[in-house]
A protein has these predicted regions:
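Class I S-adenosyl-L-methionine-dependent methyltransferase catalytic core
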Residues: 1-155
Length: 155
C-alpha cells in the first residue's frame, strides 16, 4: 500500500472546497480509507469505500471504527474496476481514486469514466508518467512525482 502523502491529501481536499459539502462520494482503491474519511470530516454526506485487498480492508474497517463513522459509510469488498461498471453518475457526486501507480489503473479509470460516467466528477491520483498523451486533456495538478487528474462528466 502506498498511502497518499499528507501534503497531497490536503491539496486535494482543499481543491474540492465546498463541493464536498453534502456530496455522495465513492473512494475507489480505498486502501486505509484516508481520502474517504477526510471527505467525511469535511462534510461529505456519505462515502462508499471500495477495496479488494483483505489486508487493506482490515485497516480500513479499523480506521472507520476508530473515527466512529455511522450509517453514512459503506464498505464494499470488490475490485474497483468491476464496481464502477455497475455505478451510474446519479449514484455519486464525486469519485476519489488512488490506484497503484504504474499498473494502468489510472488510464483505465479515465477511459471508463469517459465511456460511462460513474460519478459527476472523478479525481484520480497517479504518477506523472502513468497516462498516455491522449488522456491528458483534462485538469491536472502536480505535486512532485504525484499528479491529481480531475474530470467532469459530460452533461
Amino acid at each position: 500500500m502506498r498511502p497518499t502523502s499528507d501534503r497531497v491529501k490536503e491539496a486535494w481536499m482543499s481543491s474540492l472546497g465546498n463541493d464536498i459539502l453534502g456530496a455522495k462520494v465513492v473512494d475507489l482503491f480505498a486502501g486505509s480509507g484516508a481520502l474517504g474519511l477526510e471527505a467525511l470530516s469535511r462534510g461529505a454526506k456519505s462515502v462508499v469505500f471500495v477495496e479488494a485487498s483483505s489486508a487493506s480492508l482490515r485497516t480500513l474497517k479499523a480506521n472507520i471504527e476508530l473515527l466512529g463513522s455511522g450509517p453514512e459509510v459503506a464498505v464494499v469488498k470488490r475490485d474497483a474496476m468491476n464496481y464502477i461498471k455497475r455505478a451510474g453518475r446519479e449514484d455519486f457526486d464525486i469519485a476519489l481514486a488512488d490506484p497503484p501507480y504504474g499498473k494502468g489503473y489510472a488510464e483505465a479509470l479515465i477511459e471508463a469514466f469517459r465511456d460511462h460516467p460513474f460519478a459527476s466528477r472523478l479525481w484520480v491520483e497517479h504518477g506523472k508518467g502513468d497516462l498516455a498523451e491522449s488522456l491528458m486533456d483534462h485538469e491536472q495538478r502536480r505535486y512532485g512525482e504525484t499528479v491529481i487528474s480531475t474530470l467532469e462528466a459530460e452533461r
